[in-house]
């Protein structure tokens, strides 16, 4: 008799044990409410904004009596509403887009776009650090080939495209579509993609206009660009992007996402994006919260928050630059100008994160598989609601930890 088969629970426990051994097992945690937030994506601090809350409640109160809070079904069945379509038009107008289509999350939006739009034989070229949701969508895609290029590298994109064009002349002839996918702002290092350079390269190598850009603006929404409209609008490149995805769960303190695109693409997604078709649509409270956030953006009511956030970013960056540390393996800062996201690289990120948390500052150690091995870091996110005193307190905590680490190394 052979060995009896493992039960499912044994297999699950073994998988978790392997992650535990690699120090990369994920767990849900709850930190004290008194902790200072330097971790969340609530960049504008709208989630605690009295102005945002008042606008949201006002929209709810304006609804007719007995207006249903739940959508009741998929957008294609009973879940659609005039309010949802008006909201899509309102957001699309703000972003200078022909039309938009709401999804329940940025994850659903990316899965819907990547899984349905590329056609058989098409090529997807994507930044190696693109969101996991894009990878999920690509796995479901009918595209003939998917190939990554080095992170935010114009030369890397050029090399990949040139190699593919050489291998398949139909690309140069405009007989096959090429989708170029990237994020405008990346979540781990906060760096901004060289979008203008990408456009120039695609124009040079694909002169028949068969290169289509798919850009995820999740971490740019509300923070970058005029009135928080995003990096693409800051560059004036709206017309060059085939699809833009803006999400509402970060700086806008709500939930969901919108795919900005032309009317034909919107209609195609309604017919083919399974992550839209086979899920219950957003209910009225979610739509109202999205509307409240965008009304504040449109009216310029968040520009002061953007300005304050920018001041805190500059202050924190200066403080980090002034830290007296000698060993880059212990501590190294990666930061892109004007980004609220800071990457504090360390060989012991869990130790640094724990020290900060003990002092009342919420930061997170980011470990593999979320980031590649050797790229571990403590991720710090600044918010408009943070104070200079809180930022200085975090800097002091980091400085004290660095001094202790250097003394320990000196004894060795």
From Swiss-Prot:
Q: Which family does the record claim for this protein?
A: Belongs to the class-II pyridoxal-phosphate-dependent aminotransferase family. BioF subfamily.
Highest taxon, organism lineage: Eukaryota
SUPFAM superfamilies hit by this protein: PLP-dependent transferases
PANTHER family under this entry? Answer: 8-AMINO-7-OXONONANOATE SYNTHASE, CLASS II AMINOTRANSFERASE/8-AMINO-7-OXONONANOATE SYNTHASE
Q: What is the lineage of its organism?
A: Eukaryota, Fungi, Dikarya, Ascomycota, Pezizomycotina
Q: Which organism is it from?
A: Emericella nidulans (strain FGSC A4 / ATCC 38163 / CBS 112.46 / NRRL 194 / M139) (Aspergillus nidulans)
Pfam family example for this protein?
A: Aminotran_1_2
In what pathway does it function?
Cofactor biosynthesis; biotin biosynthesis
The entry's protein name is 8-amino-7-oxononanoate synthase
Query: Which residues take part in binding substrate?
Result: 131, 370
Task: Quote the EC number.
Answer: 2.3.1.47
- Function summary: 8-amino-7-oxononanoate synthase; part of the cluster involved in the biosynthesis of biotin (also known as vitamin B8 or vitamin H), a water-soluble vitamin that functions as a prosthetic group of many carboxylases, such as acetyl-CoA carboxylase and pyruvate carboxylase. Catalyzes the decarboxylative condensation of pimeloyl-[acyl-carrier protein] and L-alanine to produce 8-amino-7-oxononanoate (AON).
């Amino acid at each position: 008799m052979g060995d009896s088969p493992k039960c499912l629970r044994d297999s699950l426990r073994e998988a978790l044990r392997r992650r535990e051994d690699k120090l990369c097992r994920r767990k849900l945690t709850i930190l004290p409410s008194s902790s200072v937030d330097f971790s969340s994506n609530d960049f504008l601090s709208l989630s605690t904004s009295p102005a945002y809350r008042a606008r949201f409640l006002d929209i709810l109160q304006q609804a007719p009596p007995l207006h249903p809070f739940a959508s009741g079904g998929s957008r294609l069945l009973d879940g659609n509403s005039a309010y949802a379509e008006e909201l899509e038009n309102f957001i699309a107008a703000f972003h200078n887009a022909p039309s938009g289509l709401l999804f329940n999350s940025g994850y659903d939006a990316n899965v819907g776009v990547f899984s349905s739009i590329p056609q058989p034989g098409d090529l997807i070229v994507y930044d190696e650090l693109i969101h996991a949701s894009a990878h999920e969508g690509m796995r479901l895609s009918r595209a003939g080939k998917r190939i990554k290029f080095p992170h935010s590298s114009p030369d890397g994109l050029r090399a990949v495209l040139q190699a593919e064009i050489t291998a398949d002349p139909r690309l140069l002839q405009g007989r096959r579509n090429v989708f170029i996918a990237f994020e405008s702002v990346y979540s781990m290092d906060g760096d901004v993609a060289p979008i203008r350079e990408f456009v120039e390269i695609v124009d040079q190598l694909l002169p028949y206009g068969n290169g289509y850009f798919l850009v995820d603006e999740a971490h740019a929404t509300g923070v970058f660009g005029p009135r928080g409209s995003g990096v693409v609008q800051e560059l004036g490149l709206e017309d060059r992007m085939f699809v833009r995805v803006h999400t509402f769960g970060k700086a806008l303190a709500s939930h969901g996402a919108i795919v900005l695109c032309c009317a034909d693409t919107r209609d195609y997604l309604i017919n083919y994006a399974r992550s839209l078709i086979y899920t219950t649509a957003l209910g009225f409270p979610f739509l109202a919260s999205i509307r409240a956030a965008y009304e504040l953006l449109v009216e310029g009511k968040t520009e002061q928050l953007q300005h304050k956030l920018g001041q805190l970013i500059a202050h924190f960056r200066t403080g980090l630059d002034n830290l007296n540390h000698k060993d880059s393996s212990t501590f190294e800062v990666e930061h892109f100008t004007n980004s609220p996201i800071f990457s504090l690289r360390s060989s012991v990120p869990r130790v640094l994160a724990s020290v900060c948390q003990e002092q009342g500052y919420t930061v997170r150690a980011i470990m593999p598989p979320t980031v590649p091995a050797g790229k571990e870091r403590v991720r710090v996110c600044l918010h408009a609601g943070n104070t200079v005193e809180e930022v200085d307190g975090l800097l002091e905590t980091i400085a004290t930890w660095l001094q202790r680490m250097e003394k320990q190394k000196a004894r060795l």
